[in-house]
Amino acid sequence: MRRVLVVLSCVLSFCAVVAAPAAADLPVIYSGAYGYAHTTPAASPPGANDWTCKPTAAHPRPVVLVHGTFADMSNSWQALSPLLKNNGWCVFALNYGSYAGSGAIGVYGTGEIRNSAKELDAFVDKVRAATGAPEADLVGHSQGGMMPRWYLKFLGGASEVHTLVGLSPSNHGTTVDGIGLLARFFPGGSQFTGALCPACEEQIVGSQFLAELNSGGDTVPGVEYTVIQTRYDQVVTPYTSAFLSGSNVKNILLQNQCILDLGDHLSMPYDHIADADVLTALDPLHPRNPLCTPILPTEGG
């Protein structure tokens, strides 16, 4: 029933669509209702996982999209994946972190984060081998913006990744209430909490995992970091816990760009202002200047 209501809300509300400038371009739909209604987690989002794609001189590094806790590549990247593809990037996405059978019902990102980082490591190696690119760029939402830091710091990823962009990443943890809210949003998520969701416990402020991750500094040399966050994040709380410290970090608060952006944690992948910031982080020589238009919680726009 929730999925029916979600789809209906997209029909009754304005589902922002970027007009395709060329016939070959993929539609980019900035709507959380549209995106989160996708129920085929194994299906690659539009534009992703073309293993014949070769990077260009303009965009020499493939982009790997990393979803968050309880989510999957299909429901997370229905906007950003085609947007990147339309703008000339080779785009790849994965599902990771199945635990205690969670992947069987389409719930990912619940397993131990160290193991998820190993899955990401193997996937990036596969992408680099297929594309011939020595380095990749990573874009992640929620846990997907934080987990790659373990790969960069402890698994040799610093020599394989140029840029990490986090959308509301749980870099310094959150509260039990924040994780619980997230679990209730995704169908089946509430079945995989507590002991059935090691990643949930590891993202709580004060966990041993976070202490190890952040010991010795937030970043590693040679990697560029961008954090994009909303003041209205109700999952990563306080919202400032997403931000990183370091000379190679750019922290962006969306409301400093647009006071009409009321987007929350769930709307981040479907927020056209946040997604424009992603493009700028990946290609800083060609900065984007998105229009300041209303962005709604959960829905985006």
Tell where the protein language model's regions lie, with residue ranges.
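C-terminal catalytic-base region of ester-bond hydrolases, centering on the histidine
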Residues: 221-301
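Serine-dependent carboxylesterase/thioesterase catalytic core
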Residues: 67, 91, 114-214
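Catalytic nucleophile-loop/oxyanion-hole region of alpha/beta-hydrolase
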Residues: 103-119
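The feature captures the conserved acid-bearing segment of alpha/beta-hydrolase catalytic domains
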Residues: 199-236
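Short N-terminal helix/helix-N-cap motif within the alpha/beta-hydrolase-1
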Residues: 73-75, 101, 175
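Composition-driven, intrinsically disordered low-complexity tracts enriched in small residues
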Residues: 23-42, 172, 177-194, 269-273, ...
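Conserved alpha/beta-hydrolase
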Residues: 83-103
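Flexible, membrane-associating and regulatory peripheral segments of lipid-active enzymes
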Residues: 1-87, 291-301
